[in-house]
């Protein structure tokens, strides 16, 4: 009985509130640890002075690997870190990683579903040195064309923005690489709604079909397409692309005047016309487009290195569809009409110049 009463008393003691007296300190618990002492140093088991912080190159490589993370926020933040590292590096200093190692990881993000990731990716691409990007145009274009023909309207607009940046930094390489001319033009006409069976059967008397095709094109851009902003970006990128591909060279008129003056000074007694046609060709294979002894080839995947070849293909395959589409866009007026005027200007100059001298 005594032991039982003692156990009950001890259990009851745990639930009793101790009465404190005035001026008397509270009793310290049994697991109390005295921290009133002062130490000159604190030693941790895992602390070591020999472990150094990761270098900037190591952090760059780490964030580059995080661009394939499943989290949209992680991918966006990693791209922001990469952009800051490239922009803030000293002038004329090399990149933490070569562009040949950076681009293969970044290219799939052109088709990323997150709008924030694609926006940050474009900022990163603009921070890359243009001279280093020119050698990798052939790797970029397939992803850009896939984005231009994507089902998502926002993704199509982002792909066109990437293409506009690429044409700005490496325009000559874009239009001259394999598939860079015909395939990209097909993507443009597909996105704009100009490359359709109705447009090929269009006649001057069917103005209703033009307005119908314009409304269908506008609807393909989603809610933002009602304001025409995606259409303006598309037309602006198309104007830049055509200017690089078939635009009249700035030195063309100056070169012809200079050649005529030199001929007159040399003492030619007869009028000389089209002198450039009798000179040594500038291209290594001027008659390669005839394909006299070659096997049947894929025109869409070919390289059109000269303006003459690009204009010949454009005039035979795309000129009619582009002119009909521009007429419909010009009829809409507003900002879309002004944007189409830029494309029309480039097209008129190219037609006036023709295949070349």
From Swiss-Prot:
GO cellular component term, pick one: rixosome complex
Name of protein: Pre-rRNA-processing protein ipi1
Functional note: Component of the RIX1 complex required for processing of ITS2 sequences from 35S pre-rRNA.
Localization, UniProt: Nucleus
Annotated Pfam families: Ipi1_N (PF12333)
Xref: InterPro entries: ARM-like (IPR011989), ARM-type_fold (IPR016024), Ipi1_N (IPR024679)
Keywords: Nucleus, Ribosome biogenesis, rRNA processing
Domain of life, source organism: Eukaryota
Chief subcellular location: nucleus
Biased composition (Basic residues): 1-11
Oligomer and partners: Component of the RIX1 complex, composed of ipi1, rix1/ipi2 and ipi3 in a 1:2:2 stoichiometry. The complex interacts (via rix1) with mdn1 (via its hexameric AAA ATPase ring) and the pre-60S ribosome particles.
GO BP field: rRNA processing
Region span, Disordered: 1-27
Family: Belongs to the IPI1/TEX10 family.
Organism in which the protein naturally occurs: Aspergillus clavatus (strain ATCC 1007 / CBS 513.65 / DSM 816 / NCTC 3887 / NRRL 1 / QM 1276 / 107)
């Amino acid at each position: 009985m005594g032991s039982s009463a003692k156990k009950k008393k001890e259990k009851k003691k745990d639930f009793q509130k101790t009465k404190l007296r005035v001026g008397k300190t509270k009793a310290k618990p049994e697991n109390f640890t005295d921290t009133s002492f002062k130490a000159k140093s604190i030693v941790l088991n895992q602390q070591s002075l020999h472990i150094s912080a990761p270098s900037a190159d190591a952090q760059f490589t780490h964030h580059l690997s995080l661009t394939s993370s499943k989290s949209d926020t992680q991918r966006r933040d990693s791209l922001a870190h990469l952009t800051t590292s490239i922009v803030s590096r000293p002038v004329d200093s090399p990149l933490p990683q070569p562009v040949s190692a950076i681009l293969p990881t970044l290219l799939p993000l052109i088709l990323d579903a997150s709008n924030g990731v694609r926006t940050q990716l474009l900022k990163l691409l603009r921070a890359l040195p243009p001279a280093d990007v020119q050698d990798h145009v052939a790797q970029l274009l397939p992803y850009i064309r896939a984005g231009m023909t994507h089902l998502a309207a926002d993704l199509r607009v982002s792909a066109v923005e990437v293409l506009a940046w690429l044409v700005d930094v490496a325009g000559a390489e874009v239009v001259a690489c394999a598939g860079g001319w015909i395939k990209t033009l097909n993507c443009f006409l597909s996105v704009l709604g100009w490359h359709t069976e109705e447009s090929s059967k269009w006649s001057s008397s069917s103005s209703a079909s033009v307005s119908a095709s314009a409304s269908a094109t506008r609807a393909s851009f989603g809610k933002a397409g009602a304001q025409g902003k995606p259409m303006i970006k598309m037309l602006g990128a198309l104007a830049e692309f055509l200017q690089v591909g078939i635009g009249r060279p700035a030195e063309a008129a100056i070169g012809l005047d200079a050649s005529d003056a030199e001929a007159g000074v040399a003492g030619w007694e007869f009028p000389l016309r089209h002198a450039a046609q009798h000179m040594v060709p500038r291209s290594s294979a001027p008659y390669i487009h005839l394909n006299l002894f070659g096997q049947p080839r894929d025109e869409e995947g070919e390289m059109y290195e000269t303006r003459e070849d690009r204009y010949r293909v454009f005039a035979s395959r795309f000129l009619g569809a582009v002119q009909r589409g521009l007429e419909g866009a010009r009829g809409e007026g507003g900002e879309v009409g002004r944007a189409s005027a830029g494309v029309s200007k480039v097209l008129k100059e190219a037609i006036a110049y023709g295949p070349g001298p």
